């Protein structure tokens, strides 16, 4: 209701242009989808095992992030001019897409960490119980997103990659005076 009532009001008052109306209709459809996904997620926990599926949890979080990001993107495009110098450099645009994709992946794996309670198994940092690779049967379960050990390992290391790429992006922007 917080979205739909003002949206309908602005449409009837002809405050929004057609391009923005179409984009906001797309976002409203995502909001409806989010409700269905929320029920789909909760339903997975209404069994003998009272925990929700980490896959469904991550899907619910991802759709929420897409909705939020879309609204932020629309508002920034409305209030600020695009940095044409940054986006005219093809490599910087590709780099930014990679960084944003990694952030989305990190969100998904973070939901896996939450859904699997993977954060409870290795509570030491920066190493995992004194080793870079977890000591349990980790290598046999590589890319097994049902294995809490692998999920925590992936979540930690993607965070390192995002950090270093973000620092590099900051230096790139500073160096090129963007």
Language model features with spans:
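Polytopic transmembrane helical bundles with strong interfacial aromatic enrichment
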Residues: 1-178
